[in-house]
Amino acid sequence: MARNSEKAQSMLFRFREAQAADLGIIDAGRTRRPRSITEQDSIPACEKWRGQVLKEISRKVSRIQDPALSDYQIRDLNDEINKLMREKHMWEVQIRNLGGPNYMRSGGKVYDEAGREIPGGGRGYKYFGRARELPGVKELFEAAARAKQDDEKPLETRDDLRKQVDAAYYGYAPDEEDEKLLAYEAARERQAFENLAKAAAGLEPPPGWEPLPEWELPTMDEVAQELIDRRRRRLLDQL
């Protein structure tokens, strides 16, 4: 009699479970997650499966901190966490496609079911806990940290840039006071002003333009002479 009663209860349990599945009432804690995520059309069910994935991620992230684990166990556990992270992302995409909340708006941060941020979560393959100290992985993190420090270093503390700058950069080169150089620069400046004047000779002022009262524009020769005088005074001040 006891055997028949157990069979009847088992059959009744399976019947009730099938009814609950048809009605959308699913116990996420006792049921396997469906593999076909894109075929799920119930937002509450997707949220339950996502919550279950978050619980597993939180549990495995806590376990990967165990100092008794070997390197092989840490690698396998880190792979499992990354696989769960991808599954969580797929559930979030399905929830968003069904019109539910957009959990991917948090900027790559991952939180467990208690609202605590999971360190190391984000896009791409990540390393959690002691996986960051694995041989080969630790060197990658150290190299990335050094590169980041070099990029964020202020320019005034970078001696390698200042070593390439000599006195000529600040205008104290020996050839700055050469008469031939001054004459050449003056000729080039005069030629540039003449070319500019020729280009603007055929242009007419815009409609409604009026000259400023008691203001006369200098000629090209006057401008060139003024530039030469300024440069001569600057050189004398340096002496």
UniProtKB/Swiss-Prot annotation:
Q: Which SUPFAM superfamilies match?
A: ISY1 domain-like
Question: Which GO biological process categories is it annotated with?
Answer: generation of catalytic spliceosome for second transesterification step; mRNA 3'-splice site recognition
What the entry lists under Pfam families is as follows: Isy1
For this record, an example GO cellular component is: cytoplasm
- Report the domain of life of the source organism: Eukaryota
Q: Which UniProt keywords apply?
A: Cytoplasm, mRNA processing, mRNA splicing, Nucleus, Spliceosome
Location relative to the cell:
Cytoplasm; Nucleus
Annotated family: Belongs to the ISY1 family.
The record's annotation in PANTHER family points to: PRE-MRNA-SPLICING FACTOR ISY1
What subunit structure does UniProt give? Associated with the spliceosome.
Q: What does this protein do?
A: Involved in pre-mRNA splicing.
Official protein name in the record = Pre-mRNA-splicing factor isy1
Q: What is the organism field in this record?
A: Neurospora crassa (strain ATCC 24698 / 74-OR23-1A / CBS 708.71 / DSM 1257 / FGSC 987)
* Species classification: Eukaryota, Fungi, Dikarya, Ascomycota, Pezizomycotina
